Amino acid sequence: MQTDFDVIVVGAGPSGTAAAFRLKRFGYQVLLLDKQQFPRVKPCGGGISIKALNLMPWSVAPVIERAVKKLGMGVSSRATERYEVFEAQGYVCTFAVREAFDNFNFGKAVEAGVEFEHSSELSEIDERGDFVRATLGNRTITARYLIGADGANSTVRRLLSAGRWFYRGFAMEGLVSYADVGAEPLAAFFFGKVANGYGWLFPKGDHINVGLYTWDNTVTLSKEQLRAYSIDRIESDKLERIIGFPIGFGGRNYVQNRERIILVGDAAGFAEPLLGEGIHNALKSGQAAASAIIAFDDGRSSSLRLAYKKELGPIHNDLVRCENLKSFFYGNLAGIGYGALRFPVSKIALMRGFAAGKTMYELTNTFFLSPLFRPAQPPALYAHCER
């Protein structure tokens, strides 16, 4: 059947733009849908790991506001609080405002020829043999494939009645102007500030992103908790734009229940639960979905399900490892969990791994090779925003 497009991508965040851009490069006609116009406000801590930067098909240096070689890591318990500075020779993390980061990537996809449509009216998805039909308001559009990249509260996942594997974690953030604090703090994680999670301080260009995270959906985060954490860490309760948001987990058990419809990123639960990072696996799964479609069309796989499962192999391995580490680390936080983290050999390996852009699966499998790891990002690229 002749369809309107080759691929419809629902959601224009990191996973959606990654998929759309790769498909367009291979000659596919792609429609990118999003319920919001760009630029749009997107709640997120805005930490962009080196492993995520390594996946980008273009430099995002213009929207990076801080690049750091040091991270503060602390742990709080009823009995005590401990804190140390972890340092590497190369950048271990960068920070951006998600509104700017997403808009930059969206612009690159549109520049490449991806067609965009603003629509919040997706109400039905129907797979019919060799094509997919999507209903938008009072009209329908067709494509050979559809990719759901619409986040933790995915409409695509809901319409498919999919996601028994899926669960949500939560985060809450607020912004504090540098004018309201004495000095710019070190980028830092404070584990144990909330149950089964941590508090963060992420410095940006003119403000600090202050936040709380938990992978445990039985834990409630509140504005009062966030203000108390901000007062405790930077002696300021002047938080602006406080907002909570879900994070999609459970993707280690992702099941594709349609042949021509794929979920990616948080819609598939591909955020890793150890630290709650979602951008790396969003990019990687978006690219994986595109590669799976291309492989299936080229006859290199007998089904799209098998092609996507193969492409997801590295993500699956890392999610399993992060789930196991999550259980060990947070379950023994005040004792051996944080103790293992700050053990000199672990400390060095961790920071070298971060700087080299290693996943947790790669890092733990090559732990004793960490002296051979080299920083992945050129120093000159982010010298303008190094702190």
What kind of feature is each model-predicted range?
Residues 49-104:
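A conserved beta-strand/loop capping segment in the N-terminal third of enzymes
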Residues 12, 108-237, 253, 269:
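Predominantly flavin-linked oxidoreductase catalytic cores and closely associated redox partners
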Residues 16-17:
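N-terminal Rossmann-fold NAD(P) dinucleotide-binding loop
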Residues 7, 28-30, 146:
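Hydrophobic anchor at the start of a short beta-strand
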Residues 124, 217-293:
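FAD/FMN-dependent oxidoreductases across multiple families
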Residues 1-13:
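Beta1/beta-strand and adjacent pyrophosphate-binding region of the FAD-binding site
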Residues 21-43:
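Glycine-rich FAD pyrophosphate-binding loop
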Residues 291-387:
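C-terminal helical "tail/cap" subdomain of flavin- and related membrane-associated enzymes
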